[in-house]
Amino acid sequence: MKIVWYGHACFLVKTKGVSILIDPYPDVDEDRMEKVDYILITHEHMDHYGKTPLIAKLNDAEVIGPKTVYLMAISDGLTKVREVEADQEFQLGDVTVKTFYTEHPTSQYPLGYLILGEKRVAHLGDTYYSPGFRELRGQVDILLVPIGGRSTASEREAVDIIDIIRPRIVVPMHYGTYGSTGNVESFKRELQRRRVWVLVKDLKPYEGFEV
């Protein structure tokens, strides 16, 4: 499995022969992306939906997201579009994806995605802490978690989320862009202060790793 962070909340997950892009924001450079088969969108805000129409057309990729995203994609002229809700399960080739509700009050249908490939990857989109995340405990190897603190989890709340889910690896996201703050080093210090032991992958935009 390969995971690439393209900045903000945008990731590429390559697993079992399938390339899945998540939340392509407006400033992402599509020319630096690998081929994409599917695009998962967590919610309708433009810092997550941004370049979806362009990238979908360039790759002939299917767009998958909640009702608001489905309607936006149809309005943008896309035809390969699928609507999903929380607590669903679906297949992308040989990869199983599960949806779950996230705590983002300014969105109508905020979703997270649990991608079950060679490893289990959860993308939280925009979210605050939610006790419901306890249901993900034991199901996540790699957690993609926001730390920016503007309409989403702060560094402290991100540690709360990690402590309740207990993944093996964490990739911080959604910080230092579009008015969000957050800092990876202070996030790491908060983890240490709270004695929450997890491997943190501090990626630069367009960097990735294999697991």
Swiss-Prot record:
GO terms for molecular function: hydrolase activity. Keywords: Hydrolase. The keyword Metal-binding does not apply. It comes from the Archaea. InterPro entries: Metallo-B-lactamas, RibonucZ/Hydroxyglut_hydro, UPF0173_UPF0282_UlaG_hydrolase. SMART domains: Lactamase_B (SM00849). Belongs to the UPF0173 family. This is UPF0173 protein PH0120. It comes from Pyrococcus horikoshii (strain ATCC 700860 / DSM 12428 / JCM 9974 / NBRC 100139 / OT-3).
